[in-house]
From Swiss-Prot:
Name of the gene this protein is made from: y13E
InterPro entries, sorted: DUF7320
Name the UniProt record assigns to this protein: Uncharacterized 8.7 kDa protein in cd-pseT intergenic region
Annotated organism of origin: Enterobacteria phage T4
Alphabetized Pfam families for the sequence: DUF7320 (PF24005)
Amino acid sequence: MKNRLLLKEFQEKVKLFAQELVNKVSERFPETSVRVITETPRSVLVIVNPGDGDQISHLKLDFDGLVEAQRVYGVL
């Protein structure tokens, strides 16, 4: 299947995803910031703050090469 990612591809795409996400959000909220926290090589948190609190996405590369994405609610 073409959509399965290798570890290096996942890590590169996470950076692109974070940049595209902050670009999109900052269209409405110019002071938006983004942080990427690597929990493990296969698991990252992408934290976007448009100025009124963090919006957290957890991205995980499964061993089958597919990516699982979850929104995280709460405070880190």
